[in-house]
């Protein structure tokens, strides 16, 4: 249960006065974060302190993983921030996991079948435990990396490891040889293509 200044967020049943729960929710990429993936820490410290003083929740909402969001908010641990990660599939706060919305197990074989038929896609399988990339997608991932640096106008680093690169965006990414090795039930399939593949 999210906590602000020692007071649990009331459930709808507990909130008999119908007093609205106040919160500020922000997206990260292109909104809260600058182009270099940073933010004004001192200014945010002042804002967060003021929000907390008035009983207003600060919510980070993003398609990023929970681990990545915690990296962005390093230094603000135990400040009662609520995280809505993986496009809403994973919700947590400083006390831990609050809600997880995963794919139905009976749907996964068909999802895997469809993805196996699309070799041009870079695929990251995200669960509440970790993120996973298939080893047989290494060539595809490398093409996407080259495209990324080309679009950014940056030189491609020498001896780049596709899995190390993926870990920049999906911390703790693990190599797997088949979908059967995914730990946990998927909550998101992140699909990547090169800009040339976008019609």
Regions found by a protein language model. Give the residues of each.
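Extreme N-terminus of proteins, especially the signal/transit-peptide cleavage junction
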Residues: 9-22
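Short, Lys/Arg-enriched N-terminal segments with co-localized hydrophobic residues
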Residues: 1-8
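Asp-based phosphoryl-transfer active-site loop
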Residues: 20-37
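Conserved acidic, metal-coordinating active-site core of Asp-based
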Residues: 121, 126-199
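Short, basic/glycine-rich phosphate-binding loops at helix/coil junctions
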Residues: 26, 90-92, 180-184
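Active-site phosphate-binding/coordination module
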Residues: 39, 44-151
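Short, contiguous strand/loop micro-motifs
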Residues: 33-35, 98-99, 188
């Amino acid at each position: 249960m999210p906590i602000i200044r020692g007071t649990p967020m009331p459930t709808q049943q507990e909130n008999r006065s119908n007093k609205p729960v106040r919160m500020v929710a922000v997206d990260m990429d292109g909104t809260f974060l600058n182009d270099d993936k940073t933010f004004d820490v001192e200014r945010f410290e002042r804002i967060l302190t003021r929000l907390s003083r008035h009983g207003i929740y600060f919510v980070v909402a993003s398609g990023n993983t929970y681990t990545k969001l915690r990296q962005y908010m390093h230094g603000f641990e135990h400040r009662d921030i609520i995280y809505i990660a993986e496009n809403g599939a994973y919700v947590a706060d400083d006390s831990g996991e609050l809600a997880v919305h995963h794919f139905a197990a009976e749907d996964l074989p068909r999802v895997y079948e469809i993805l196996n038929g699309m070799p041009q896609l870079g695929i990251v399988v995200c669960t509440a435990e970790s993120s996973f990339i298939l080893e047989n997608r290494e060539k595809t991932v490398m093409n996407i990396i080259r495209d990324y640096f080309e679009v950014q106008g940056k030189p491609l680093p020498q001896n780049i490891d596709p899995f190390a690169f993926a870990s920049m965006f999906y911390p703790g990414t693990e190599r797997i040889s088949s979908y059967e090795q995914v730990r946990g039930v998927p909550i998101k399939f992140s699909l990547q293509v090169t800009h040339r593949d976008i019609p």
